[in-house]
Amino acid sequence: MADSQLFCVAEERSGHCAVVDGNFLYVWGGYVSIEDNEVYLPNDEIWTYDIDSGLWRMHLMEGELPASMSGSCGACINGKLYIFGGYDDKGYSNRLYFVNLRTRDETYIWEKITDFEGQPPTPRDKLSCWVYKDRLIYFGGYGCRRHSELQDCFDVHDASWEEQIFWGWHNDVHIFDTKTQTWFQPEIKGGVPPQPRAAHTCAVLGNKGYIFGGRVLQTRMNDLHYLNLDTWTWSGRITINGESPKHRSWHTLTPIADDKLFLCGGLSADNIPLSDGWIHNVTTNCWKQLTHLPKTRPRLWHTACLGKENEIMVFGGSKDDLLALDTGHCNDLLIFQTQPYSLLRSCLDCIGKNSIMLESQISLLPPKLLQQVLKKITFWAAANHREEQRVQKEETENKYQWISSN
Protein backbone atom coordinates (compact mmCIF):
# COMPACT_ATOMS: atom_id res chain seq x y z
CA MET A 1 0.00 0.00 0.00
CA ALA A 2 1.33 3.45 -0.92
CA ASP A 3 2.28 5.84 1.89
CA SER A 4 -0.41 8.28 0.72
CA GLN A 5 -3.06 5.61 1.39
CA LEU A 6 -1.58 4.13 4.55
CA PHE A 7 -0.94 7.55 6.07
CA CYS A 8 -4.21 9.18 4.97
CA VAL A 9 -5.78 11.78 7.26
CA ALA A 10 -9.34 12.91 7.92
CA GLU A 11 -10.31 15.83 5.70
CA GLU A 12 -9.76 19.42 6.74
CA ARG A 13 -12.66 20.78 8.77
CA SER A 14 -13.90 23.18 11.44
CA GLY A 15 -16.91 23.04 13.75
CA HIS A 16 -16.75 19.24 13.98
CA CYS A 17 -17.17 16.82 16.90
CA ALA A 18 -14.41 14.66 18.36
CA VAL A 19 -14.23 12.29 21.34
CA VAL A 20 -11.76 9.75 22.71
CA ASP A 21 -12.89 6.27 23.73
CA GLY A 22 -10.28 3.66 24.57
CA ASN A 23 -7.38 3.71 22.10
CA PHE A 24 -9.20 5.77 19.48
CA LEU A 25 -10.04 9.36 18.63
CA TYR A 26 -13.33 9.64 16.72
CA VAL A 27 -14.12 12.58 14.41
CA TRP A 28 -17.48 13.39 12.80
CA GLY A 29 -19.07 16.31 10.97
CA GLY A 30 -17.99 19.90 10.54
CA TYR A 31 -17.55 21.94 7.40
CA VAL A 32 -14.87 23.17 5.02
CA SER A 33 -14.74 26.06 2.54
CA ILE A 34 -14.47 25.22 -1.15
CA GLU A 35 -14.34 28.17 -3.56
CA ASP A 36 -15.99 30.48 -1.01
CA ASN A 37 -18.79 27.98 -0.35
CA GLU A 38 -19.36 26.31 3.01
CA VAL A 39 -19.49 22.57 2.38
CA TYR A 40 -20.56 20.24 5.19
CA LEU A 41 -18.58 17.03 5.60
CA PRO A 42 -20.48 13.78 4.80
CA ASN A 43 -22.87 12.71 7.55
CA ASP A 44 -22.27 9.01 6.81
CA GLU A 45 -18.53 9.11 7.54
CA ILE A 46 -16.75 8.76 10.86
CA TRP A 47 -12.97 8.86 11.09
CA THR A 48 -10.97 6.93 13.68
CA TYR A 49 -7.42 7.71 14.76
CA ASP A 50 -5.49 4.88 16.43
CA ILE A 51 -3.59 6.61 19.24
CA ASP A 52 -0.95 3.84 19.34
CA SER A 53 -0.19 3.46 15.62
CA GLY A 54 -1.02 7.00 14.49
CA LEU A 55 -3.16 5.71 11.60
CA TRP A 56 -6.44 7.21 10.42
CA ARG A 57 -9.31 5.20 8.92
CA MET A 58 -12.65 6.26 7.47
CA HIS A 59 -15.75 4.16 8.21
CA LEU A 60 -19.11 4.47 6.47
CA MET A 61 -22.06 4.82 8.83
CA GLU A 62 -25.59 3.43 8.64
CA GLY A 63 -28.92 3.94 10.39
CA GLU A 64 -30.87 7.16 11.04
CA LEU A 65 -28.23 9.61 9.90
CA PRO A 66 -28.06 13.13 11.35
CA ALA A 67 -27.92 15.92 8.81
CA SER A 68 -24.46 17.08 7.78
CA MET A 69 -23.82 19.88 10.28
CA SER A 70 -21.33 22.16 11.96
CA GLY A 71 -21.45 23.47 15.51
CA SER A 72 -23.02 20.30 16.92
CA CYS A 73 -22.15 19.26 20.45
CA GLY A 74 -20.55 15.81 20.76
CA ALA A 75 -19.98 13.86 23.98
CA CYS A 76 -19.19 10.27 24.89
CA ILE A 77 -20.85 8.20 27.64
CA ASN A 78 -20.09 4.48 28.09
CA GLY A 79 -18.78 4.07 24.56
CA LYS A 80 -21.65 5.93 22.88
CA LEU A 81 -21.15 9.15 20.95
CA TYR A 82 -24.07 11.55 21.41
CA ILE A 83 -24.61 14.43 18.96
CA PHE A 84 -26.97 17.29 19.81
CA GLY A 85 -27.84 20.49 17.98
CA GLY A 86 -25.83 22.11 15.22
CA TYR A 87 -26.48 24.05 12.06
CA ASP A 88 -27.17 22.76 8.55
CA ASP A 89 -28.61 24.05 5.28
CA LYS A 90 -32.10 24.09 6.81
CA GLY A 91 -31.17 26.00 9.96
CA TYR A 92 -30.60 25.16 13.61
CA SER A 93 -31.24 21.72 15.10
CA ASN A 94 -32.37 20.41 18.48
CA ARG A 95 -32.28 16.74 17.55
CA LEU A 96 -30.31 14.16 19.54
CA TYR A 97 -28.56 11.13 18.03
CA PHE A 98 -26.18 8.48 19.28
CA VAL A 99 -23.91 5.80 17.83
CA ASN A 100 -22.24 2.89 19.62
CA LEU A 101 -18.47 3.19 19.14
CA ARG A 102 -17.63 -0.18 20.72
CA THR A 103 -18.60 -2.47 17.87
CA ARG A 104 -16.82 -5.75 17.15
CA ASP A 105 -17.19 -5.53 13.37
CA GLU A 106 -16.53 -1.77 13.10
CA THR A 107 -20.10 -1.13 11.95
CA TYR A 108 -21.31 2.25 13.14
CA ILE A 109 -25.10 2.72 13.18
CA TRP A 110 -26.72 6.05 14.06
CA GLU A 111 -29.94 6.10 16.08
CA LYS A 112 -32.16 9.15 16.48
CA ILE A 113 -33.57 9.48 19.99
CA THR A 114 -37.29 10.12 19.58
CA ASP A 115 -38.83 8.12 22.44
CA PHE A 116 -37.98 10.52 25.27
CA GLU A 117 -39.75 12.31 28.10
CA GLY A 118 -39.60 16.04 28.71
CA GLN A 119 -38.80 19.03 26.53
CA PRO A 120 -35.46 19.36 24.68
CA PRO A 121 -33.67 22.72 24.37
CA THR A 122 -34.67 25.06 21.57
CA PRO A 123 -32.67 24.67 18.32
CA ARG A 124 -29.10 26.00 18.57
CA ASP A 125 -25.42 25.50 17.72
CA LYS A 126 -22.05 26.34 19.30
CA LEU A 127 -23.26 25.18 22.73
CA SER A 128 -21.29 23.18 25.30
CA CYS A 129 -21.83 19.93 27.19
CA TRP A 130 -20.72 18.57 30.54
CA VAL A 131 -20.85 14.80 31.11
CA TYR A 132 -21.68 13.89 34.71
CA LYS A 133 -23.30 10.78 36.23
CA ASP A 134 -24.47 9.41 32.85
CA ARG A 135 -26.10 12.73 32.09
CA LEU A 136 -25.51 15.17 29.25
CA ILE A 137 -25.70 18.70 30.65
CA TYR A 138 -25.95 21.41 27.99
CA PHE A 139 -25.27 25.12 28.43
CA GLY A 140 -25.71 28.16 26.19
CA GLY A 141 -25.33 28.35 22.43
CA TYR A 142 -26.70 30.47 19.59
CA GLY A 143 -30.07 29.67 18.05
CA CYS A 144 -33.69 30.57 17.56
CA ARG A 145 -36.84 30.81 19.68
CA ARG A 146 -40.44 31.70 19.02
CA HIS A 147 -41.92 34.76 20.69
CA SER A 148 -43.76 32.57 23.20
CA GLU A 149 -40.44 30.98 24.23
CA LEU A 150 -38.54 34.20 25.05
CA GLN A 151 -37.09 34.21 28.57
CA ASP A 152 -34.42 36.01 30.60
CA CYS A 153 -31.93 33.31 29.55
CA PHE A 154 -31.89 34.71 25.99
CA ASP A 155 -30.17 37.78 24.46
CA VAL A 156 -31.87 38.74 21.19
CA HIS A 157 -29.64 39.33 18.17
CA ASP A 158 -32.13 39.43 15.29
CA ALA A 159 -35.83 38.84 14.70
CA SER A 160 -38.40 37.99 12.06
CA TRP A 161 -41.52 39.74 13.31
CA GLU A 162 -43.62 38.27 10.54
CA GLU A 163 -42.80 34.70 11.61
CA GLN A 164 -42.37 35.64 15.30
CA ILE A 165 -38.92 33.99 15.40
CA PHE A 166 -35.97 35.46 17.29
CA TRP A 167 -32.27 34.60 17.06
CA GLY A 168 -29.75 35.10 19.83
CA TRP A 169 -27.58 33.74 22.63
CA HIS A 170 -28.58 31.47 25.53
CA ASN A 171 -27.40 30.81 29.09
CA ASP A 172 -29.93 28.14 30.07
CA VAL A 173 -29.05 24.66 31.36
CA HIS A 174 -30.70 21.50 30.02
CA ILE A 175 -30.10 17.89 31.05
CA PHE A 176 -30.61 14.66 29.16
CA ASP A 177 -30.51 11.57 31.39
CA THR A 178 -29.22 8.74 29.19
CA LYS A 179 -30.58 6.06 31.54
CA THR A 180 -34.17 7.30 31.72
CA GLN A 181 -34.21 9.00 28.28
CA THR A 182 -35.55 12.17 29.89
CA TRP A 183 -35.01 15.86 29.18
CA PHE A 184 -35.38 18.33 32.05
CA GLN A 185 -34.09 21.65 33.34
CA PRO A 186 -32.56 21.73 36.83
CA GLU A 187 -33.72 24.28 39.34
CA ILE A 188 -30.77 26.65 39.73
CA LYS A 189 -30.47 27.16 43.49
CA GLY A 190 -28.25 30.23 43.61
CA GLY A 191 -25.26 32.19 42.44
CA VAL A 192 -24.91 34.57 39.52
CA PRO A 193 -25.15 32.77 36.15
CA PRO A 194 -22.84 33.67 33.26
CA GLN A 195 -24.37 35.97 30.68
CA PRO A 196 -25.72 34.31 27.53
CA ARG A 197 -23.03 33.20 25.07
CA ALA A 198 -21.98 30.82 22.31
CA ALA A 199 -18.66 29.50 20.99
CA HIS A 200 -17.49 29.21 24.60
CA THR A 201 -15.93 26.07 26.02
CA CYS A 202 -16.47 23.82 29.02
CA ALA A 203 -14.88 21.08 31.12
CA VAL A 204 -15.75 18.98 34.18
CA LEU A 205 -13.54 18.63 37.25
CA GLY A 206 -15.10 16.56 40.02
CA ASN A 207 -18.66 17.80 40.45
CA LYS A 208 -18.02 21.21 38.91
CA GLY A 209 -18.78 22.17 35.33
CA TYR A 210 -16.50 25.00 34.20
CA ILE A 211 -17.06 27.39 31.29
CA PHE A 212 -14.66 29.96 29.87
CA GLY A 213 -15.04 32.79 27.37
CA GLY A 214 -17.30 32.82 24.34
CA ARG A 215 -19.19 35.52 22.47
CA VAL A 216 -22.40 37.53 22.86
CA LEU A 217 -23.27 40.28 20.36
CA GLN A 218 -19.88 41.80 19.38
CA THR A 219 -18.20 41.00 22.70
CA ARG A 220 -15.79 38.14 23.34
CA MET A 221 -15.13 37.24 26.95
CA ASN A 222 -12.42 35.77 29.19
CA ASP A 223 -14.47 35.06 32.29
CA LEU A 224 -14.38 31.73 34.14
CA HIS A 225 -17.40 30.28 35.97
CA TYR A 226 -18.44 26.92 37.31
CA LEU A 227 -21.77 25.26 38.04
CA ASN A 228 -21.92 22.79 40.93
CA LEU A 229 -23.51 19.77 39.24
CA ASP A 230 -24.86 18.38 42.54
CA THR A 231 -26.29 21.51 44.19
CA TRP A 232 -27.00 23.48 40.98
CA THR A 233 -25.43 26.69 42.24
CA TRP A 234 -23.35 29.03 40.10
CA SER A 235 -20.00 30.30 41.32
CA GLY A 236 -20.33 33.73 39.78
CA ARG A 237 -17.32 35.08 37.92
CA ILE A 238 -14.22 33.53 39.49
CA THR A 239 -11.62 36.04 40.70
CA ILE A 240 -8.28 35.26 39.07
CA ASN A 241 -4.96 35.75 40.82
CA GLY A 242 -2.52 37.24 38.34
CA GLU A 243 -2.60 37.31 34.56
CA SER A 244 -5.56 36.00 32.53
CA PRO A 245 -5.79 34.77 28.93
CA LYS A 246 -7.11 37.12 26.26
CA HIS A 247 -10.82 37.42 25.55
CA ARG A 248 -11.77 34.79 22.97
CA SER A 249 -14.29 32.47 21.36
CA TRP A 250 -14.01 29.20 19.40
CA HIS A 251 -11.35 27.86 21.81
CA THR A 252 -11.11 24.63 23.84
CA LEU A 253 -10.82 23.78 27.54
CA THR A 254 -9.69 20.31 28.58
CA PRO A 255 -9.22 18.77 32.07
CA ILE A 256 -5.67 17.43 32.47
CA ALA A 257 -5.59 16.67 36.22
CA ASP A 258 -7.90 16.71 39.22
CA ASP A 259 -7.26 20.44 39.64
CA LYS A 260 -6.04 21.70 36.25
CA LEU A 261 -7.59 22.83 32.95
CA PHE A 262 -5.83 23.33 29.61
CA LEU A 263 -6.97 26.24 27.41
CA CYS A 264 -6.01 26.26 23.74
CA GLY A 265 -6.36 28.72 20.86
CA GLY A 266 -9.48 30.53 19.71
CA LEU A 267 -10.29 33.86 18.07
CA SER A 268 -9.36 36.99 20.02
CA ALA A 269 -11.48 40.10 20.61
CA ASP A 270 -9.59 41.83 17.77
CA ASN A 271 -10.22 38.87 15.41
CA ILE A 272 -6.72 37.39 15.60
CA PRO A 273 -6.45 33.55 15.47
CA LEU A 274 -4.64 32.44 18.63
CA SER A 275 -1.94 29.81 19.08
CA ASP A 276 -1.45 30.17 22.83
CA GLY A 277 -1.96 27.60 25.57
CA TRP A 278 -2.71 28.17 29.25
CA ILE A 279 -3.09 25.97 32.32
CA HIS A 280 -5.52 27.01 35.05
CA ASN A 281 -5.12 25.70 38.60
CA VAL A 282 -8.57 25.66 40.19
CA THR A 283 -7.06 25.45 43.68
CA THR A 284 -4.99 28.63 43.42
CA ASN A 285 -7.18 30.28 40.75
CA CYS A 286 -4.07 31.11 38.74
CA TRP A 287 -3.50 30.94 34.98
CA LYS A 288 -0.06 30.02 33.65
CA GLN A 289 0.82 30.57 30.00
CA LEU A 290 2.82 27.83 28.30
CA THR A 291 5.84 29.14 26.42
CA HIS A 292 6.87 26.03 24.47
CA LEU A 293 3.84 25.77 22.15
CA PRO A 294 4.32 26.51 18.43
CA LYS A 295 3.39 30.14 17.77
CA THR A 296 2.97 29.66 14.01
CA ARG A 297 0.08 27.18 14.16
CA PRO A 298 -3.01 28.99 15.48
CA ARG A 299 -6.32 27.15 15.79
CA LEU A 300 -9.94 28.13 16.27
CA TRP A 301 -13.16 26.08 16.19
CA HIS A 302 -10.99 22.99 16.60
CA THR A 303 -11.42 20.10 19.03
CA ALA A 304 -9.13 19.08 21.90
CA CYS A 305 -9.39 15.64 23.52
CA LEU A 306 -7.46 14.05 26.37
CA GLY A 307 -5.50 10.93 25.41
CA LYS A 308 -4.80 7.91 27.60
CA GLU A 309 -1.45 9.33 28.78
CA ASN A 310 -2.78 12.83 29.47
CA GLU A 311 -1.69 14.22 26.12
CA ILE A 312 -3.94 16.81 24.49
CA MET A 313 -4.90 15.94 20.91
CA VAL A 314 -5.96 19.02 18.96
CA PHE A 315 -7.55 18.24 15.60
CA GLY A 316 -8.82 20.40 12.77
CA GLY A 317 -10.10 23.92 13.11
CA SER A 318 -9.03 26.99 11.18
CA LYS A 319 -5.86 29.06 11.17
CA ASP A 320 -7.71 32.10 9.75
CA ASP A 321 -10.43 34.42 11.00
CA LEU A 322 -13.52 32.47 9.87
CA LEU A 323 -15.57 35.65 9.79
CA ALA A 324 -13.27 37.36 7.27
CA LEU A 325 -11.14 34.78 5.40
CA ASP A 326 -12.72 31.35 5.63
CA THR A 327 -10.04 29.34 3.80
CA GLY A 328 -7.52 28.07 6.33
CA HIS A 329 -9.15 24.86 7.58
CA CYS A 330 -6.71 22.28 8.94
CA ASN A 331 -6.46 18.51 9.26
CA ASP A 332 -3.22 18.08 11.12
CA LEU A 333 -3.20 16.64 14.63
CA LEU A 334 -1.31 18.65 17.24
CA ILE A 335 -0.29 16.66 20.31
CA PHE A 336 0.63 18.52 23.51
CA GLN A 337 2.27 16.57 26.32
CA THR A 338 1.06 17.76 29.74
CA GLN A 339 3.06 15.42 31.98
CA PRO A 340 6.09 13.10 31.66
CA TYR A 341 5.34 9.93 29.72
CA SER A 342 5.71 6.54 31.39
CA LEU A 343 9.06 4.77 31.06
CA LEU A 344 7.46 2.21 28.72
CA ARG A 345 6.05 4.95 26.46
CA SER A 346 9.40 6.75 26.38
CA CYS A 347 11.21 3.54 25.43
CA LEU A 348 8.67 2.72 22.72
CA ASP A 349 9.04 6.21 21.26
CA CYS A 350 12.83 5.89 21.26
CA ILE A 351 12.69 2.55 19.43
CA GLY A 352 10.07 3.86 17.00
CA LYS A 353 12.23 6.85 16.07
CA ASN A 354 15.36 4.70 15.63
CA SER A 355 13.85 1.55 14.14
CA ILE A 356 16.34 1.31 11.25
CA MET A 357 19.33 1.34 13.58
CA LEU A 358 17.67 -1.22 15.91
CA GLU A 359 16.18 -3.41 13.18
CA SER A 360 18.19 -6.56 14.01
CA GLN A 361 17.27 -6.42 17.72
CA ILE A 362 13.56 -5.64 17.33
CA SER A 363 12.68 -9.10 16.02
CA LEU A 364 14.03 -10.65 19.24
CA LEU A 365 11.42 -8.98 21.44
CA PRO A 366 8.61 -10.99 23.12
CA PRO A 367 5.43 -11.10 20.96
CA LYS A 368 3.31 -8.75 23.08
CA LEU A 369 6.04 -6.14 23.35
CA LEU A 370 6.88 -6.59 19.67
CA GLN A 371 3.32 -5.64 18.70
CA GLN A 372 3.60 -2.44 20.73
CA VAL A 373 6.94 -1.62 19.11
CA LEU A 374 5.62 -2.23 15.60
CA LYS A 375 2.69 0.11 16.25
CA LYS A 376 5.07 2.79 17.50
CA ILE A 377 7.30 2.36 14.42
CA THR A 378 4.21 2.94 12.28
CA PHE A 379 3.29 5.95 14.44
CA TRP A 380 6.60 7.71 13.82
CA ALA A 381 6.70 6.78 10.14
CA ALA A 382 3.24 8.33 9.75
CA ALA A 383 4.21 11.41 11.78
CA ASN A 384 7.33 12.00 9.67
CA HIS A 385 5.41 11.52 6.42
CA ARG A 386 2.69 13.98 7.43
CA GLU A 387 5.21 16.56 8.62
CA GLU A 388 6.98 16.38 5.25
CA GLN A 389 3.62 16.82 3.50
CA ARG A 390 2.75 19.79 5.72
CA VAL A 391 6.06 21.54 5.08
CA GLN A 392 5.74 21.00 1.32
CA LYS A 393 2.21 22.39 1.38
CA GLU A 394 3.29 25.48 3.33
CA GLU A 395 6.19 26.09 0.95
CA THR A 396 3.82 25.86 -2.02
CA GLU A 397 1.32 28.24 -0.39
CA ASN A 398 4.05 30.74 0.49
CA LYS A 399 5.41 30.60 -3.06
CA TYR A 400 1.92 31.20 -4.46
CA GLN A 401 1.39 34.16 -2.12
CA TRP A 402 4.75 35.64 -3.13
CA ILE A 403 3.92 35.31 -6.83
CA SER A 404 0.47 36.86 -6.28
CA SER A 405 1.94 39.86 -4.47
CA ASN A 406 4.69 40.57 -7.03
Curated annotation (Swiss-Prot):
Tissues with expression: Widely expressed, with high levels in skeletal muscle, pancreas and liver. Undetectable in peripheral blood leukocytes.
Name of the molecule in the record: Kelch domain-containing protein 1
GO biological process terms held by the UniProt record: protein ubiquitination; ubiquitin-dependent protein catabolic process via the C-end degron rule pathway
Domain of life: Eukaryota
Protein keywords: Cytoplasm, Kelch repeat, Repeat, Ubl conjugation pathway
This protein's pathway: Protein modification; protein ubiquitination
Matches recorded under InterPro entries: Kelch-typ_b-propeller
Gene3D superfamilies, per database record: Kelch-type beta propeller
Compartment list: Cytoplasm, Cytosol
Organism annotation: Homo sapiens
Kelch repeats: 24-76, 80-134, 135-181, 208-258, 260-307, 311-361
One Gene Ontology cellular component annotation held by this UniProt entry: cytosol
Any one Pfam family match given in the protein's UniProt record, by short name: Kelch_KLHDC2_KLHL20_DRC7
Assembly notes: Component of a CRL5 E3 ubiquitin-protein ligase complex, also named ECS (Elongin BC-CUL2/5-SOCS-box protein) complex, composed of CUL5, Elongin BC (ELOB and ELOC), RBX1 and substrate-specific adapter KLHDC1.
Gene Ontology MF terms in the entry: ubiquitin-like ligase-substrate adaptor activity
Function of the molecule: Substrate-recognition component of a Cul5-RING (CRL5) E3 ubiquitin-protein ligase complex of the DesCEND (destruction via C-end degrons) pathway, which recognizes a C-degron located at the extreme C terminus of target proteins, leading to their ubiquitination and degradation. The C-degron recognized by the DesCEND pathway is usually a motif of less than ten residues and can be present in full-length proteins, truncated proteins or proteolytically cleaved forms.
